[in-house]
Amino acid sequence: ELLRTPIRLLAGLLGKVIERQAGAETLQTIEYLRQGFIEERNNPDPERRAALMRTIAALDNDRLKHVIRGFSLYFALANLAEEDLLRQKRADLRARGGELWEGSFRHTLQQCRDNDLSPEQLTELIGQLRFIPVFTAHPTEARRRTTMSVLQEIYRHCATLDHAPENSPAWNHAVAETADLIDLLWSSDEVRSRKTLVYDEINNGLHYFNVSLFQAIPQVYRNLRSALNDIYPELEKMVLPPLLRFGSWIGGDRDGNPFVTHQTTEQAVLVHADNVLRYYSKQLKHLRKRLLHCSSIIAIDPAIDARNEHYARLGVTVFDYNPEDYNNEPYRRLLALMRAKIQHTNRYIQSMGEDQAAAEHAYPNAEAFLDDLILIRNALKQHDPEQARGDIQDLIRLVRSCGFHMASLDIRQESTWHTSVVADLFAHAPNLPDYNALDEASRQQALTQLIAAPGAPLLFEQNLSPETQEQLALMRTIARLRELVGARTFGSYIISMTNRTS
């Protein structure tokens, strides 16, 4: 019943939209089929099933399209209602402070305590934990990002509908907004009208970071920290390792796909970096509005002023409108400088290292950015420990998880491609045998000797096959992006369909 109520509300709003947009007869057809198949599932009847199938077969193309669309939106809204109910149950469980669901941090840590796992053993165990969800481009996910964003808005309104009294101004407003959004869903393309490009797939991955993961990652660490403090208070001072990281195959998984090239891989990494660095910039701006501490009122660690002085050359540009701005608010001054440095970092990365003006003030790596954040957090601990445990700590944990790369890109290509490339390199290099003519043992011996050698034969790349030139370009791109963005920019290099070592 808890699920039927919101589904009934959302379905009612959808029904009004269908009646207005596609006509009462379409709505009646959808309801007839819905009720009929519910009855058929509960009490199978061959005659009823045949009648339902005849109804579907008799629909003209336009009516059939509307019926399919109606069911598609109905199930999308029903899924939202179910997700919202599960969210409510988890929130109620947390609010009561009772036993949480199996697999939660609190439940798992309590099991560790009950089974006499010592704090030292738990520290070692947590230090070994790595949870790395990997995004893949699923060809079955044809929904546009726009559609997913509208569904996300409806989901947010569901929270209001859960808590506001029925027919109250807040409830009525949420109903009206939800009805407008359902109308928008009906009126817009649910799927793309063109073939999905790799760039579309890359941007789809960004959607989940922007609407959910950037906010959820720090909360995961907060939940773990809270559970540890309650169940293992001896570990209150333990620094949580970056156990949560992300991977992606989108833009790296070629596996015989000619549309995924080294340019695609470069684009994927640059888009990832741009997205996460823009988010960091936004968070630094937010922190600048929170850390208003004035040095004329409280004592602030001199290390903050020293860091501001270290960035004085950048400050000439950042504070050109007023060189004295934030002089008595050292945190705000440093955060403004850090935000400028993050923006320079993004420009430098997006230029593939060509923008030397940006390079002067760019962070050399995510660790240098972390160093500034940790400096601020440690200074706050001396006079405002609550702030030190707040948003600044969340950002530190996010940077430890996502770096400047956001998600480590895995590279995948099939073994026959690599065999062809290696054979081509052998064929165009002096003093190397015909790779294709070698047996497995000879191939391994030749490759081992080349890998162990201090250098490689001089190659005339213009004579190489397009596939070999593409592979060399990919390897150079990987090396350059690792240098620019960070060592964790790429994850695994996967050679698929292998059947021998060479």
Question: Model-predicted segments: where are they?
Answer:
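Long, K/E/R/D-enriched contiguous segments that form extended
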Residues: 455-462, 466, 480, 487-502
